[in-house]
Amino acid sequence: MECFIMLGADARTLMRVTLLLLWLKALPSLIDLSQTGSTQYLSSPEVVIPLKVTSRARGAKNSEWLSYSLVFGGRRHVVHMRVKKLLVSTHIPVLTYTEEHTPLSDYPFVPSDCYYHGYVEGALESLVAFSACNGGLQGVLQMNGFSYEIEPIKHSSTFEHLVYTLNNNKTQFPPMLCSLTEKRLLYQPFGVEEAKKSAMKQNYGKLWPHMWFLELAVVVDYGFFTNAQQNLSKVRGDVVLVVNMVDSMYKPLDTYVTLVGIEIWNRGNVLPMENIHQVLEDFSHWKQISLSQVHHDAAHIFIRSSLISVLGIAYIAGICRPPLDCGVENFQGDAWSLFANTVAHELGHTFGMKHDEESCSCGKSGCVMSTFRVPAERFTNCSYSDFMKTTLNQGTCLYNHPRPGAGFLVKRCGNGMVESEEECDCGSVQECEQDPCCFLNCTLRPAAACSFGLCCKDCKFMLLGELCRPKINECDLPEWCNGTSHQCPEDGYVQDGVPCGAGAYCYQKQCNNHDQQCREIFGKGARSASHNCYKEINLQGNRFGHCGTDGTVFLKCRMSDVFCGKVHCENVEDIHHPQAPYVLQNIYANGITCWSTGHCLGMGVPDVGEVKDGTTCGVGKICLHKKCVSLSVLSNACLPETCNRKGVCNNKHHCHCDYGWSPPFCLHRGYGGSIDSGPTSQKRRVIITVLSITVPVLSILICLLIAGLYRIYCKIPSGPKETKASSPG
């Protein structure tokens, strides 16, 4: 039995579904974009070396422009670009969370002079949006109906880059579905139709302003943060890269998109991520309170959730109408330019744009508000009309020019968040009265050194070497306090690819293998099935055996990848472990019973039966993204020899030394740890030192004592004694 997601009570025919979609599209509503598979490329990437050339940019001073020559697709292309203005503040406010889930704001330096926009020489209406912040060119280039992504090759000594051609074939993507109920219609206090009636009375030619300025706040969920290897700097870079592309798409609308703040949920999701409609509603309420310190015209949340089967959702015409000025975008791990399309699309709904109809045209094969998600760069005439109707009627918040560095409001103390120039923040008056470490004015009390953190106890820094984060498994590493900070060092773990368990390898802090996954699903005693089970089932391409999906159908595994698709088990005694909506299948393969779980597309829950990344699939090979790849794809910047074989490499490619050896390379005697873990325990050092002195002394004393007692109590004879015979008397 196959699985179907039904629309309506019967949903018997495709025509009925089609009519329903057309009806939904004609109404103001919440709009969502259905999920697609991973990015499809027309061909393998080409290696190019951008050559800097003398600028011939049209109508501008050469000092303002950079020009590069790139050869790909059999042709030479000259790109002209210049630095963007108003894209991001130099010190953009970034809000994160401590391990106690206390909000913590920072103003890290984010370069604002390395994001570019421009055009391709000789290509009318071309689009270029590049970042050059990391020593190479990364971004999107669109021209002549094709979209290309470019990214630098890491550690290349010759400035090599990869150029990918994105597939513009819209038939690969299912149409967007509009989730509409009468209840959701009533939720919007002021609908698009009323905006239209009011705007139609206006004369657009007279009222069209010179420019619009959208101040955008972006929240990043834990899944998106994890996708960036839990690297805060990478998250910031990814967000700005996407906003740079979105800003370029909105330039024809005379609209600047400025990033005014980022919040990163680096300690777990604040809201449940199971239903995108609920996420949008919860986010709209949450941001009214928790994001109120960030001045913004719109707030969107970037998520990565396998529990959600759509790409995005937003309130129509929510701009300048809090709390409806928000949206959700679900990143699926594909090209950044496609994700930027999703963000631009959902922002379009925020601006009042609906999905394009057949009569709409943008002069390109892909339009931003198309009912199919394809690489796009332009808005249609319909989108322009919707944009004008909404912004001229309610877009007053878009008139003001962004204030550099003014993302957060002035008032900070008392909101429970430790921000710049604050020593602590105990919150309300009542909370501060109970706080032994912090005053109401956000300063520390006398004799208090800290008020929060894993290395703060009783308002004091914990001693140097105190354990603040213990090791939880063989692929994890411990951390210790340094005695001068309230924060525990960043959570570190064993470098990906280091052997663990029985023939397995550490990956992302876990030691995964097929046997363990079988036990997790079917209980104690279950183990991975024979190779025949994997070969027979995972080549079928159904819910019981596959190597991923393209968004609509299950994909058959290649023979080389069969151990990276679905996990198959044997020796199953407890068949009640899997919970709904999973179904079980058992088949016989060469006399062996193979058990596996079936998963239905569109159910909104992860597939527990998919083989986990990092699982061994052959000698020197692991599973990554449903592919069996060589361990060599992982970074080997640190080797056992690097650590003198007296330690293990960590996720930052530094040595974490065994006890008895000291970092950085475990060459000299010491107390273990790494340059990232904090100094190891002082107590342990003292104990070991004392024991090293006292144990030998005690051993000698005990030996002497035993010898003395033995002589006293055993009375060892010294030789025969003479006795005199007595004479008879």
Curated annotation (Swiss-Prot):
The free-text tissue note of the record is:
Highly expressed in Leydig cells. Expressed also in cauda epididymidis, vas deferens, convoluted tubules, kidney and the parietal cells of stomach. Not detected on developing spermatocytes or mature sperm.
Provide the residues annotated with a glycan attachment (glycosylation): 169, 231, 381, 441, 482
Please give a single GO biological process term from the UniProt record.
proteolysis
Q: Could you list which ranges are Extracellular topological domains?
A: 210-685
The UniProt entry lists membrane topology as: Single-pass type I membrane protein
PTM summary: Has no obvious cleavage site for furin endopeptidase, suggesting that the proteolytic processing is regulated.
- Its predominant location is membrane
Q: What is its EC number?
A: 3.4.24.-
Describe cofactor binding as the record notes it: Binds 1 zinc ion per subunit.
Chain residues in the propeptide: 40-209
InterPro entries recorded for this chain? Answer: ADAM_Cys-rich, Disintegrin_CS, Disintegrin_dom, Disintegrin_dom_sf, EGF-like_dom, MetalloPept_cat_dom_sf, Peptidase_M12B, Peptidase_M12B_N
Give the residue interval(s) assigned to the motif Cysteine switch.
176-183
Q: Where is the active site?
A: 346
Peptidase M12B domain segment(s): 212-402
PROSITE patterns, A to Z: ADAM_MEPRO, DISINTEGRIN_1, DISINTEGRIN_2, EGF_2, EGF_3, ZINC_PROTEASE
Q: Which residues cross the membrane?
A: 686-706
Per UniProt, residues of the EGF-like domain are 638-667
Protein name, as recorded = Disintegrin and metalloproteinase domain-containing protein 21
Lineage, broadest ranks:
Eukaryota, Metazoa, Chordata, Craniata, Vertebrata
